[in-house]
């Protein structure tokens, strides 16, 4: 099962629906769910959803603090991506302009999260803030003309972040990205 931490984003149910469509068991839980309850669910992976504010990410940061107790792949989407970057020492700030549109990203490193995708993909973005600088020990996976860090991965741990929304129908190959994450988790 993949746990989806609900950070109050408008697309959180789309993440769940896409995973279910792919045949993956998934569950949306409040981001305030205690760590012991999350551990008892024995997730194979965790997704940090998008949301309105880094100040309202509940226990997501605690999951990162206690990563060795979970030891499962993590995917941060939009706000979740920013949270991961900030936690590991990256820089998050306002973008040059708010993005609420389709953006073409360039995949720099196919990696396992983008396996089988073309080098350029149009994705849906819905954010004001963005990762301005990669955290130490992270690799850049994708970028765009409007955002320097569209996707990243920890060099040693299966921790990923994407600025865009793979769960939204407008994102080309979005279901493939979530399928690849489910494969990384051993759920497909």
UniProtKB/Swiss-Prot annotation:
Residues annotated as domain Glutamine amidotransferase type-1? 1-188
Pfam families assigned? GATase
The catalytic activity, as recorded, is: XMP + L-glutamine + ATP + H2O = GMP + L-glutamate + AMP + diphosphate + 2 H(+)
Active site feature: 78 (nucleophile), 165, 167
**Alphabetically ordered keywords of this record:** ATP-binding, Glutamine amidotransferase, GMP biosynthesis, Ligase, Nucleotide-binding, Purine biosynthesis
Name the domain of life this protein comes from: Archaea
GO annotations of cellular component type: cytosol
Q: Which InterPro entries match?
A: Class_I_gatase-like (IPR029062), GATASE (IPR017926), GMP_synth_GATase (IPR004739), GMP_synthase_A (IPR023686)
Please give the HAMAP family that the UniProt record associates with this protein: GMP_synthase_A
- Oligomeric and partner information: Heterodimer composed of a glutamine amidotransferase subunit (A) and a GMP-binding subunit (B).
NCBIfam families per UniProt: guaA_Nterm, PRK00758.1
UniProt protein name: GMP synthase [glutamine-hydrolyzing] subunit A
Instruction: State the organism named in the record.
Output: Pyrococcus furiosus (strain ATCC 43587 / DSM 3638 / JCM 8422 / Vc1)
């Amino acid at each position: 099962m993949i746990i989806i931490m609900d950070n109050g984003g408008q697309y959180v149910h789309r993440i769940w629906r896409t995973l279910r469509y792919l045949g993956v068991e998934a569950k949306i839980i409040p981001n305030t769910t205690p760590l012991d309850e999350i551990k008892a669910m024995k997730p194979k992976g965790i997704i940090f959803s998008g949301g309105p504010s880094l100040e309202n990410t509940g226990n997501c940061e605690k999951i990162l603090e206690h990563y060795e107790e979970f030891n499962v792949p993590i995917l941060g989407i939009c706000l979740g991506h920013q949270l991961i970057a900030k936690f590991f020492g990256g820089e998050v700030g306002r973008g040059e302009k708010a993005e609420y549109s389709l953006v073409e990203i360039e995949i720099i490193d196919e990696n396992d999260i983008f396996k089988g995708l073309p080098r350029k993909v149009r994705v849906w973005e819905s954010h004001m803030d963005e990762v301005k600088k990669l955290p130490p020990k992270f690799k850049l996976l994708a970028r765009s003309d409007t955002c320097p860090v569209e996707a990243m991965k920890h060099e040693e741990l299966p921790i990923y972040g994407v600025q865009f929304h793979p769960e939204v129908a407008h994102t080309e190959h979005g279901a493939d990205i979530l399928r690849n994450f489910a494969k990384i988790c051993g759920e497909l």
